[in-house]
């Protein structure tokens, strides 16, 4: 049983929380199934992909934004020095205008940290708005490149030289438009994926995708589509948009409860995890079995027949690991979350021993019970954790601690000297 619980938590924990989609003009499709096209601009094929977010962890440094009303500052946490500073080395800078390398307006949209050498920030807004890419020099300032014509681009992945995304607004019967933005030149390339194909996350040196497999092209008409898709299967692939290389990883039957993902719940250590659901009359679903698919071994195994509690779900996945390097993990997390009781309790499982342990240390500064949370993992294996926050969930305290110490209930961590702004 303990082994089963371990695998379950593993499954639950590593959700590749990423999926994205850029929009740009796509080629009109015929009724036949079109072949996907690779991005036309040459790109390195050895660099792995990683999801982009408003924070960035390279194993030595953690970059994240702090919001200050209508603007944000990019902060840098150095693990070796255990200090957090503004990412600005301009003498006498007040960090209150665009002249500051760390200053970014909030406005609409999101600021994403996308590379660290050189340091780049991408600002994305609603569909139709230009994408802005900033190259940041802490001592000199920042240079901005504006990319027009991206359309409904939802940027979500990077390989260090280019950004990638897809347009999820098109019908599943149509080929999925995708785009690539070269970070050096700013060149925008458009290409297509298979009809209904979506990006789910990263896998090996490619992207994890899913698409419907049907005997005939899916119709566009709503009722005809709903009838035709019932007999579809969902194929999960590792796909490299730079070369067009595609490797099938898993196949699942269509499931009306989770029509686009057929219960896909995450990826951990190159294994795919799927949850089966049982629909209820009140419109809710009950979690049933947990299945793990190991593409390398060609095996599919049911690891769990009944979930221990409906309130358990995914928590921390691959995003805590350094962007570059080995993406395997010993520690997998799960969270008990019950909005009815306002309870949120993180757990971690040691895959080597099968032990499941609760994180008991509480975050300071909150009027309600919230435990410390893991933000990132350093190259030396320690975890960067948030130890204090305000009622708006702004981070007020951080520390470094080994996983073993944290899960033993210790508060003997190395505190980060926080920037006082």
Language model feature labels by segment:
Residues 19-22:
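Bacterial signal peptide processing site
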Residues 15-17:
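C-terminal motif of bacterial Sec signal peptides marking the signal peptidase cleavage site
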Residues 42-48, 72-98, 128-149, 171-193, ...:
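Surface-exposed loop/turn elements that mediate protein-protein interactions on large endomembrane-trafficking
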Residues 27-85, 89:
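An edge-strand/N-cap motif at the start of beta-rich repeat modules
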Residues 53-72, 105-126, 156, 161-171, ...:
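Short beta-strand elements that form the blades of beta-propeller/WD-repeat-like
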Residues 48-58, 95-114, 150-160, 193-205, ...:
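Repeated scaffold domains used in trafficking and secretory/extracellular systems
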Residues 2-10:
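Sec-dependent signal peptide recognition
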């Amino acid at each position: 049983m303990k082994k089963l619980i371990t695998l379950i938590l593993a499954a639950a924990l590593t959700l590749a929380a990423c999926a994205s989609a850029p929009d740009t003009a796509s080629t009109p499709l015929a009724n036949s199934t079109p072949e996907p096209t690779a991005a036309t601009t040459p790109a390195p094929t050895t660099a792995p992909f990683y999801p982009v977010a408003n924070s960035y962890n390279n194993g030595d440094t953690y970059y994240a934004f702090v919001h200050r009303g209508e603007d944000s500052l990019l902060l840098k946490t150095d693990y070796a020095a255990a200090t957090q500073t503004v990412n600005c080395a301009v003498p006498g800078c007040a960090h209150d205008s665009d002249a500051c390398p760390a200053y970014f307006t909030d406005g609409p949209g999101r600021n994403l940290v996308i590379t660290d050498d050189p340091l780049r920030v991408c600002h994305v807004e609603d569909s139709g708005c230009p994408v802005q890419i900033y190259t940041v020099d802490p001592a000199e300032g920042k240079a901005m490149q504006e990319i027009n014509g991206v359309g409904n681009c939802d940027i979500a992945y990077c390989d260090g030289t280019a950004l990638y995304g897809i347009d999820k607004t098109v019908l599943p019967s149509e080929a999925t438009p995708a785009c690539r933005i070269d970070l050096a030149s700013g060149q925008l390339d458009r290409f297509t994926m298979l009809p209904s194909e979506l990006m789910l996350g990263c896998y090996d040196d490619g992207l994890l995708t899913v698409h419907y497999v049907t005997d005939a092209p899916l119709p566009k008409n709503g009722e005809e589509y709903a009838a035709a898709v019932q007999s579809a299967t969902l194929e999960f692939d590792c796909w490299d948009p730079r070369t067009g290389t595609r490797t099938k990883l898993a196949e699942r039957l269509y499931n009306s409860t989770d029509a686009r993902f057929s219960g896909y719940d995450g990826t951990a250590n190159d294994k795919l995890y799927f949850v089966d659901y049982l629909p209820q009359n009140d419109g809710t679903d009950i979690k049933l079995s947990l299945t793990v698919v190991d593409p390398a071994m060609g095996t599919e195994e049911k690891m769990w027949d009944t979930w221990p509690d409906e309130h358990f779900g995914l928590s921390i996945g691959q995003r805590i690991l350094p962007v570059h390097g080995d993406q395997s993990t010993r520690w997998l997390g799960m969270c008990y979350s019950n909005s009815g009781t306002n309870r949120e309790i993180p757990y971690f499982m040691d895959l080597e021993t099968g032990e499941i342990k609760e994180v008991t240390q509480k975050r300071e500064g909150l009027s309600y019970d919230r435990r410390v949370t893991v933000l990132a993992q350093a190259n030396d294996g320690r975890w960067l954790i948030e130890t204090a926050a305000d009622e708006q969930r702004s981070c007020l305290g951080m520390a470094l601690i080994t996983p073993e110490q944290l899960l033993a209930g210790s508060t003997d961590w190395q505190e980060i000297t926080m920037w006082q702004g």
